[in-house]
Amino acid sequence: LELANSLTGNGGNVLFNTAEESLFQLKMTVERLQLKHGFSAGQETMVPRLLKNCDELRAAQPDKPFVLVIDSLQTLNDGKYGEHNVNNKTAERSLLMITEYCKSTFANAIVIGQVTKDGKMAGANVLKHMVDALITLDVERKDDDLMGCRILQTEKNRFGGAAHTFWLAIRERGFQEISRMSVT
């Protein structure tokens, strides 16, 4: 949400699409974080309808760069086998539809994916090869000084360096980057 707010504040046209939370929950979080830039929000799970919504938002503000934020990939359905059939293959086909849409319209997508109980990316490994960057967010459980902080790491980046690590603390108004020296 903070990223969607920042992108909108910097002149972007952003749709935050979630099936993980209700729009009411999303609104409450936006208010708590005091996000002010008014990005669009939706709850579409069917990718063809989602992309139609994207077209409408892009047409309303054609001069602004468009960013689609999806929370999460595993809740989307490409519609190939009906509206209620969601599985790993559905996620692959949905991601393919989104990446093809972005390539053909010069839009950008940030797709949030789920993880398994042991912290691995949910779904097939092919998903990693379909994206330009893979960024993980985890909870620090080993270092006593950073216990409970979030670790943001780049695992893959086609356009720059990977293996970058950032430590984030969760504050009342969202994430705040911290350095190891600031917590000791």
Indicate where each model-derived feature is located.
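Phosphate-binding/switch region of NTP-binding enzymes
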Residues: 92, 96-184
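Conserved inter-motif catalytic segment of the P-loop NTP-binding fold
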Residues: 2, 10-100
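Aromatic pocket-lining residues of Rossmann-like dinucleotide-binding sites
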Residues: 7
